[in-house]
Amino acid sequence: MDSPTNDGTCDAHPVTDEPFIDVRETHTAVVVLAGDRAFKAKKPVVTDFCDFRTAEQRERACIREFELNSRLAAQSYLGIAHLSDPSGGHAEPVVVMRRYRDKQRLASMVTAGLPVEGALDAIAEVLARFHQRAQRNRCIDTQGEVGAVARRWHENLAELRHHADKVVSGDVIRRIEHMVDEFVSGREVLFAGRIKEGCIVDGHADLLADDIFLVDGEPALLDCLEFEDELRYLDRIDDAAFLAMDLEFLGRKDLGDYFLAGYAVRSGDTAPASLRDFYIAYRAVVRAKVECVRFSQGKPEAAADAVRHLIIATQHLQHATVRLALVGGNPGTGKSTLARGVAELVGAQVISTDDVRRRLRDCGVITGEPGVLDSGLYSRANVVAVYQEALRKARLLLGSGHSVILDGTWGDPQMRACARRLAADTHSAIVEFRCSATVDVMADRIVARAGGNSDATAEIAAALAARQADWDTGHRIDTAGPRERSVGQAYHIWRSAI
């Protein structure tokens, strides 16, 4: 074998506690570990994402792998060498790398139960710095557009469908596709904003715990995606979400959450929680597809891994679902308490009609005296103006990936119909809560209020209770009991809305 194409001046640590010669295999490559070096050769295979049938194609792929990985791990990638053929055939290219001990591998450390929070902090720092200097341009930005994001999902799901009801469930694939389409269809504002903020980068795109090593306290991030440039052009939170997903797959969702939170702090990324979940799910689907390929290559154990990855994808898409909740009821029924309690659990944005009314009055959009039903501040025209403004604000938040809880009486069926149209327009799941309490309880709560923006009186509450219209689509929440009970009931209903 000839020498690497660079000078190879980086000395490797001796590997004395593992076999001198070992072999590892992926679905597209074979890695021979020999002494203090690792030699990676491409398999002569064709998949939906690569074509390595000829030596020339494999040569180009090896060179590209070396160049791209030198961005993040220059001390680990030593160059390109060639295996010569004694019969005179074409020399086989191999990527020459520094060999690391298995105990230095992040995946090994995690599965051994070792403390890795410090390592994850270092990885988050390295990745954030890498993304800060990563290439950005108009061509890269196009891969963050709604159409490109949807296309990637559908291409992966189409590949998974080849294995439906053989390796993975066809029903699960269809459910995933539905949730993906709903998220993407209503989030044009979110994806456009990510492009405008410079979040689309030429990244790593294959950040797995198995390919990260801790060397002298510093992380080496190996094996980025090299076979198709466009797939490496991605949202930076998507790049980080890959490792978060993989840590969850290793049984440590807590570490995945820890890493992603640390990355967000170090990079200054402001992606909503829904987008983080969306991309964790995407990476789980990508890995499920890879496991299906491995299964088709004679690795029966890969089937269980594919199923587990789709479970992760489904769970995160459920969390990513953008929801619009109406929390209604008469004054004093505890609807604001319920709205705040649910929002604390799910991270939703609360819009209170009381707050909107106060702001509109302060800026002169609506006028009138408070305290009288159907007139003054509570005239029909003013009530409609308040609810329309609340819905306008909700539309902006929903389109940006934020779930919204609208806190108001919601006694008017026409206003509830407007809210349902908004949910349909933004492809958001809608859930409606109707808070209830006795007239005496409502009156006591109104009297006991300290400050706030509500102008409702006990008399208004009693009058509204007397004219309460049917609300068949509202889940009745009895708020007379402990707060924890009513909030817990609403939380479970919220989660079931897809």
Curated annotation (Swiss-Prot):
<dbReference type="InterPro" id="IPR011009">
    <property type="entry name" value="Kinase-like_dom_sf"/>
</dbReference>
<keyword id="KW-0067">ATP-binding</keyword>
<dbReference type="InterPro" id="IPR027417">
    <property type="entry name" value="P-loop_NTPase"/>
</dbReference>
<keyword id="KW-0964">Secreted</keyword>
<dbReference type="GO" id="GO:0005576">
    <property type="term" value="C:extracellular region"/>
</dbReference>
<comment type="function">
    <text>Some isolated peptides of this protein are able to bind to human U937 monocytoblastic and A549 epithelial cell lines.</text>
</comment>
<protein>
    <recommendedName>
        <fullName>Uncharacterized protein Rv2004c</fullName>
    </recommendedName>
</protein>
<dbReference type="InterPro" id="IPR052732">
    <property type="entry name" value="Cell-binding_unc_protein"/>
</dbReference>
<dbReference type="Pfam" id="PF13671">
    <property type="entry name" value="AAA_33"/>
</dbReference>
<keyword id="KW-0547">Nucleotide-binding</keyword>
<dbReference type="GO" id="GO:0005524">
    <property type="term" value="F:ATP binding"/>
</dbReference>
<dbReference type="GO" id="GO:0046812">
    <property type="term" value="F:host cell surface binding"/>
</dbReference>
<feature type="binding site">
    <location>
        <begin position="329"/>
        <end position="336"/>
    </location>
    <ligand>
        <name>ATP</name>
    </ligand>
</feature>
<dbReference type="GO" id="GO:0009274">
    <property type="term" value="C:peptidoglycan-based cell wall"/>
</dbReference>
<keyword id="KW-0134">Cell wall</keyword>
